[in-house]
């Protein structure tokens, strides 16, 4: 099926945010998924800059798998990325990334990544990106918002690495402003904000990051009652990794993971996804092909 493509100028409708006020480049991408017969298709994409999706895949029939390509050079101060994804009624899209998103040292301006995901009634969306690496000296703002209509189903995660300890970068300087919102029928299910400086006691506190370099959150909605217990029983957590799961009264499952490195945290997230996919989405696990490369 042909996909409508359009270059996206900053003033075009619907742009996800106003033009940046600080120096730097801007990348923007709008994706629309819709059900076409028995399959979901990427029916429209509008883009500006290097944030792109190339081809899509259907390895499990109806769901559409898409790979988001981040700028290969990463982000520095003043750069902005805007991603807007709409999943139409009854459609099912799964998105991942082939590599990490990287935020580099800033001289003072924020590097900003805004992501908005809108799910129509009966839509299913899985957002399973690779890690976001915050290099020492970066000033990073990560904004994620999920808007769910009635009957929509969601599995999504975000994994953040503070520096690259294996390469000697322990994030000695830098700032993170991380924001997360999940709404269902415009009613809030979850609101979170993390403001973290490199020297924040939260990094080593037992009630915080416990000295770990990598942290992640996985969300799933609607989660059947008791799924958090099934998940805890099923996971084989790698050494050094801490994991907790909570189900909110509204049916939103929140899974938190802490670990010393990207690989063990990612393996934990992938295990969790394999465990909860069928109860939440109604399909057995079908990992994106890129995970095997």
Swiss-Prot record:
Keywords: Chaperone, Cytoplasm, Nickel insertion
Subcellular locations according to the entry: Cytoplasm
InterPro entries: UreD
Biased composition annotated in UniProt, kind: Low complexity: 7-22
Main subcellular localisation: cytoplasm
One GO CC term on file: cytoplasm
Pfam family of the protein (one): UreD
GO-annotated molecular function: nickel cation binding
Region (Disordered): 1-22
Domain of life of the organism encoding this protein: Bacteria
Record-stated family: Belongs to the UreD family.
Assembly mode: UreD, UreF and UreG form a complex that acts as a GTP-hydrolysis-dependent molecular chaperone, activating the urease apoprotein by helping to assemble the nickel containing metallocenter of UreC. The UreE protein probably delivers the nickel.
Function of the molecule: Required for maturation of urease via the functional incorporation of the urease nickel metallocenter.
Annotated protein name in UniProt: Urease accessory protein UreD
Organism phylogeny: Bacteria, Pseudomonadati, Pseudomonadota, Gammaproteobacteria, Chromatiales
Gene name of this polypeptide: ureD
């Amino acid at each position: 099926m042909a996909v409508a493509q359009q270059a996206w100028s900053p003033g075009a409708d619907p742009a996800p945010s106003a033009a940046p006020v600080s120096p730097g480049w801007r990348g923007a991408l709008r994706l629309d998924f819709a059900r076409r017969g028995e399959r979901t298709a990427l029916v429209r994409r509008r883009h500006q800059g290097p944030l792109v999706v190339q081809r899509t895949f259907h390895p499990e029939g109806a769901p559409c798998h898409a790979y988001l390509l981040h700028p290969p050079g990463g982000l520095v101060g003043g750069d902005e990325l805007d991603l807007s994804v709409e999943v139409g009624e009854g459609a099912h899209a799964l998105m991942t990334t082939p590599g990490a998103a990287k935020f580099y040292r800033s001289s003072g301006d924020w590097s900003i990544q805004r992501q908005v995901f809108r799910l129509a009634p009966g839509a299913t969306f899985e957002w399973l990106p690779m890690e976001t690496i915050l290099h020492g000296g970066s000033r990073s703002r990560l904004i994620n918002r999920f808007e769910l209509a009635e009957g929509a189903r969601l599995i999504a995660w975000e994994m953040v690495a503070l520096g690259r300890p294996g390469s000697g970068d322990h994030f000695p300087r830098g700032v993170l402003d991380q924001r997360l919102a999940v709404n269902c029928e415009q009613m809030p299910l979850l609101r979170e904000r993390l403001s973290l400086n490199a020297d924040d006691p939260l990094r080593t506190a037992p009630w915080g990051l416990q000295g770990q370099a990598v942290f992640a959150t996985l969300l799933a909605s609607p989660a059947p009652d008791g799924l958090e217990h099934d998940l805890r029983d099923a996971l084989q957590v790698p050494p050094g990794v801490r994991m907790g799961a909570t189900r909110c009264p509204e049916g939103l499952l929140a899974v938190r993971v802490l670990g010393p490195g990207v690989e063990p945290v990612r393996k934990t997230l992938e295990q969790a996804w394999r465990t909860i996919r069928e109860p939440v989405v109604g399909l057995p696990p079908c990992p994106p092909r890129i995970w095997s490369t």
